Each structure stands twice: as C-alpha cells, then as structure tokens.
C-alpha cells in the first residue's frame, strides 16, 4: 500500500497538485505516515509557502532523514523563504557536504549569497558575490535547468560597483566587460564603464562610452555632467560648459550643488570669473545656502585667482568663523595676508 501511495504522491508532484498531496497524507493515520511520506508532506507544504509547517514536519523526522541531502535542502529552502539566511546557509551547506552535485542546493545557495552581497561594505559584498558566482558556476556544470545569465550579469555588475567603491578601477573594469560579454547591453553598464574609464584617466575611451549611453537613450543630469567634467579634464572647457548647460536644463532640482561646483571650475578655465562669482553669489543669497562651506570656499578661490585679496579674505574669514580649519584654509590665509601686506 505504501508503495502505491508513494507512486501516487510522485505523480501528483509532477502535476503540482500539492494541496491534494497534503489532504491525502493528512488523512492517513500516524502509523501509515513513515518518514518518506512525511518528507513528501513537508515538500508539499513548502510548495504552498507554509514554511513553518514544513520545518515542523521535517523536525519530526530528523533522526532518520537529517543525513540526506533532500532533508537538509528542504530545511535550507524553508529558512531561506523565512528570511533566516544563517540557518538557510547552514542547512544548504550540509546538503552539499552530503551531495556536492545537488542542483537545487547549489542554485539556492548561489541565490542566497547573491542577496547577502547587497550590503554597503564593499569588501564583505565582494566576498559574498564571489561565493555566489562560484555556486552558480558549479550549478551551470550540472545540466542546469534554470537560465542563470541574468544572475551572472547582475553579480558582475555588483562586483564592478564594489571594486569602484574601493577605487580598484582596473578590477572593476574586468567585471564590467564580463557583464557585457554575457549580453548586458543596458545603459547602466556603459554608464558605469565610462565612469570607470574616466577614473582611470582614460578620457577618450570614457567619452566613447558616454556617447554609447546617449545612443541607448539615456539623457539626464548625471550623464551630461559626467561628459562635461571629462571634457574639462582634457582641457576642453567650452565643450565642458556646453554639456554642463544641458545637465542644468535637465536637473530635477533648482539648486544642484555638484553642478554649481563643477560649473565654477569650468568657468574659471574659460577665464569667466565674474560669471562664476555671479552664479555662486546668487545661490548663497538663499537662506539655506548662505553658510555652505564648499560654495564659500569656491568664492574665496575665485577671488584669489582674480588677485582680489580683500574679497578673498572676507570669505576666508567667514569660513574660519563657520568652523573650517584645515591646511587649505590656513595656507590661503597666509597667502592673502602676505599679498595684502605688500
């Protein structure tokens, strides 16, 4: 009878009739429920997203089944969906210790480590993402049933992002190009690659990739500001200003401090000191920006560049009153005082 029952359960599993399996097994007496049948019941509850019930049943057959990969996988699977990653990891690793070629365990552990890689700390994120990559690679060699291309692309993107955060731009570039080789042709990957290349001072290559991003349809403040700054870095300030104007037109905010700072540098390169001063003074006339350290520092620098040391001193002293006390400020105070004494 039990053989016939298990055969019927297997057929219902193929048809994904999990509620029928639950109803049928729950109707049995305790004597008729051996560990194999209870394991099937646990799996059925798991498919119905009743993970606490799944664990309860699995615990009841722990003595006879905990040395099997399927029991450990089911425990890991349940804890994964109960958002308990440490327990999920423990059982999935045990499943693979018993059977290293267990496809579901390799796949789920890869997903788990991928998710654990979504953290701010770059070194720790890289640690988890590399683990995820390793398990996906094992899974891919086991006659994989799932298409993992998008997962692999996502991991390569995140590895690149974290290496860029660590300023390891060469390693980041390797992962960005790997993502592209896997089929990633989205705006994000080329935006990141362009930023990466600019960080490596490979400006012409960066500009080529920024143009690729535009061709893919992205047109926003960040992109045009990045292009502008790249042109500024290769000493093409007029082109830089043209793109900065596009960036400002698309800015979602009235005052974008990052744009203002970059625009000021570009205007100085064009010897448009008065225009830079006018732009910054217009912003600091607003109550919320009147004590902005960065803007006031820019004004002081512009006046020093103009050799208007009295005006420069006004802003340097204001910066000191606001609490700035660093090498830049002290060096420029000494410079200004020395010029005014002559």
Model-flagged regions — what are they?
Residues 3, 36, 70, 104, ...:
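Start-of-helix register in tetratricopeptide repeats
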Residues 16, 49, 83, 117-120, ...:
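Residue-level detector of the short coil/turn that links helix A to helix B
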Residues 27-32, 63-67, 136-152, 249-254, ...:
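Flexible helix-coil transition and linker loops at the boundaries of alpha-helical arrays
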